[in-house]
Amino acid sequence: EITGIAPVFADEGTVANTAGPSLTFYEASILNRAALEAIFAAHAVDVIIHFAGFKAVGESVAKPLEYYWNNITGTLVLADVAREHGCKNIVFSSSATVYGEPEFIPITESCPKHDATNPYGWTKSMLEQILSDLYTGDNEWNIVLLRYFNPIGAHESGRIGEDPKGIPNNLLPYVAQVAVGKLESVGVFGDDYPTPDGTGVRDY
């Protein structure tokens, strides 16, 4: 049981309607230094759980500059503001994409990182390095890097969960939209890729 904690969270409006009365909500971008300064000034922030960032692999290939700017610059702004306010605890949402083309499967924590295969993956890999360097330079920081694959599921209210506008970038929401009739079918393209089933589309 966790007691005596007053959670504060900031996002761009996705979950505001689901937050209970015990949460203080701010709609803000991590690129907005003034907004972050105001949040840290108003609250004694002890720990940051950092899930903010763009995350669509395919989109990152089409919009690399936007991904590097948002994910890397935003995290630098967040870390700098946190440091100024004495908050040196961060849990960072990284990604299994940092493994690139893994040497073995299933991937374990002993699997070495490889070159990422897309800009999204590179932002996560670079941020892991930046945060590791931050700790090396100042070991008062406590930094946790979470490398996971696509989490799935939704809040029971249906207000929080992956329900993308337009065509989904990940497989499960695509299948879910077919199941509820939003999309007609799941397309399978190609049959000669070097994958077990011959298809080239993977759930990033």
Kindly label every feature range from the protein language model.
Residues 1-47, 167:
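N-terminal Rossmann/SDR dinucleotide-binding element
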Residues 62-80, 84, 88-89, 98-150, ...:
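Catalytic helix-loop patch of NAD(P)-dependent Rossmann-fold dehydrogenases
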Residues 22-24, 142-144, 185-187:
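Conserved beta-strand segments of alpha/beta enzyme cores
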Residues 60, 112-113, 149-204:
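A conserved pocket-lining segment of Rossmann-fold NAD(P)-dependent short-chain dehydrogenase/reductase
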Residues 95:
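Residue(s) in the substrate-gating loop at a strand-loop-helix junction
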Residues 27-70, 81-84:
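NAD(P)H-binding glycine-rich loop region in Rossmannoid oxidoreductase-like domains
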Residues 33, 54-57, 98-99, 151-154:
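Active-site loop signature of alpha/beta-hydrolase-fold enzymes
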